[in-house]
């Protein structure tokens, strides 16, 4: 009896661990968010694209790449990809773009992870705080918000 219980437990653990790790079973949107969250706490580094340091477009590029989706590596090029949508239609995996300087140019982007209080919450690489989750309800981000784009149908 003990041997069969041990065998059943072993089979259960072996199959369930694979299900947790297998991104192929995740929807692409969920996979992008999952992989982006692996960078939480990573310090900001302009031009960075790994856990030692990463910038906003590097975070987006890496999260999408892990799902087998090729996207541009700069905010300037990312802003031309996908379809522009209203922020109230934003779903996990969509991109938010911001103007963080007085210039008209888009300078920052993040990945939507969900909604809170009717506004998107997003993961991004902040130049002062590294990879964090923020909300469009925050005054700074609400004022800097420029557009939302959908790259995954």
Feature names for model-found ranges:
Residues 2-10:
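Sec-dependent signal peptide recognition
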Residues 15-16:
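C-terminal motif of bacterial Sec signal peptides marking the signal peptidase cleavage site
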Residues 19-24, 28, 34, 69, ...:
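Aromatic- and glycine-rich peptidoglycan recognition patches
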Residues 30, 34, 38, 58-62, ...:
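Solvent-exposed, polar/charged alpha-helical surfaces in well-ordered, non-transmembrane soluble domains
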Residues 42-92:
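Catalytic cysteine-centered active-site loop
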